């Protein structure tokens, strides 16, 4: 290197986002179905009691200890109906309990779905990758409007503007519905990395006014690839964006057999590393 190239006069700068967000997908939501044998093994509790007395208490402890904020993405029900014949959720006690605690902790309520069926049109063939159903456009509109109504009924006078696609799957047709029919939604938080039917994004303000903000890493199985992705995103945009599902503890592919104690420890290790590595990173909601 020449002395000219190495001169301290040559300093470059560029704008960064400077924000850290932790998403809770499927939260608040009804108690999910799934194999709770590892929850039973480790805690001798059913799934509902485990979420209330263990998982949520632990997640809130990270708020108290590290100052992070959660954006919860609501699922109204886990039914498979995509006909557009929507109905309101009658059992709201868990939504109110968890949602209000989330808000009081400095968090935010967002939208995930009327159910957990991605907004994909009838013309889409999942080719066996997913067993999800598909929608007519009018049914998508009905379902999303019901979700907005439901959230507003439970959490009035609270801004709710973030949409998280179920399984990070969102079609062009579904996105069009969000933009044209659901004015409450101002931003979509999906995935930075491409995958089967994934709605992958860059950080940007789209020409139609929607804010695109991808999530970078997920869960409590934070392998070398995820750690590299997290480090790279801090370098590029000075951003952390992580999401986790409560039902990771029920899904072997997401670490259920390891047990919540291990997943929790991995997550806390990441949060602690983040705080020590980037102490000036702002704790934000989506």
Where are these regions (language model features)?
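Catalytic domains of carbohydrate-active enzymes, especially glycoside hydrolases
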Residues: 15-28, 38-71
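His/Asp/Glu-enriched short active-site or ligand-binding loop at hydrolase and phosphoryl-transfer sites
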Residues: 182-222
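Alpha-helical scaffolding within the catalytic cores
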Residues: 56-57, 90-100, 194-201, 219-231
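Metal-dependent polysaccharide deacetylase catalytic core of the NodB/CE4 family, i.e.
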Residues: 30-32, 64-173, 237, 242, ...
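Catalytic grooves of carbohydrate-active enzymes
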Residues: 12-14, 18-31, 152-162, 168, ...
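Short, small-residue-biased leader/transition segments that mark boundaries at the very start
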Residues: 1-7
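A solvent-exposed, charged loop/short amphipathic helix patch at secondary-structure junctions
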Residues: 30-52, 124-135, 251-276
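Short, surface-exposed basic-aromatic patches at helix termini and helix-loop junctions that form
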Residues: 100-102, 175-185, 234
């Amino acid at each position: 290197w020449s002395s000219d190239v190495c001169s301290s006069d040559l300093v470059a700068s560029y704008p960064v986002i400077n924000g850290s967000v932790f998403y809770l997908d499927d939260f608040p939501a009804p108690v999910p179905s799934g194999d709770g044998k590892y929850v039973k093994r480790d805690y001798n509790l059913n799934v509902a009691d485990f979420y209330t007395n263990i998982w949520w208490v632990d997640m809130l402890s990270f708020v108290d200890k590290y100052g992070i904020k959660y954006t919860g993405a609501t699922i109204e029900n886990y039914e498979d109906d995509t006909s557009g014949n929507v109905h309101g959720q009658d059992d709201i006690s868990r939504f109110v309990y968890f949602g209000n605690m989330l808000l009081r902790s400095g968090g935010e309520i967002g939208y995930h779905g009327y159910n957990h069926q991605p907004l994909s049109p009838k013309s889409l063939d999942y080719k066996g990758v997913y067993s999800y159903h598909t929608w007519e456009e009018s049914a998508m509109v009905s379902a999303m409007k019901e979700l907005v109504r439901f959230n507003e009924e439970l959490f009035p006078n609270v801004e709710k503007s973030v949409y998280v696609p179920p399984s990070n799957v969102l079609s062009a047709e579904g996105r069009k519905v969000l933009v044209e029919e659901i004015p409450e939604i101002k931003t979509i938080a999906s995935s930075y990395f491409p995958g089967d039917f994934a709605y992958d994004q860059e950080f940007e303000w789209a020409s139609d006014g929607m804010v695109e903000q991808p999530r970078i890493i997920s869960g409590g199985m934070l392998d070398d690839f995820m750690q590299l992705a997290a480090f790279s995103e801090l370098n590029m945009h000075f951003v952390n964006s992580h999401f986790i599902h409560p039902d990771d503890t029920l899904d072997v592919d997401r670490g259920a057999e390891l047990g919540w104690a291990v997943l929790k420890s991995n997550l806390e290790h990441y949060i602690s590393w983040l705080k020590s590595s980037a102490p000036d990173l702002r704790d934000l909601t989506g």
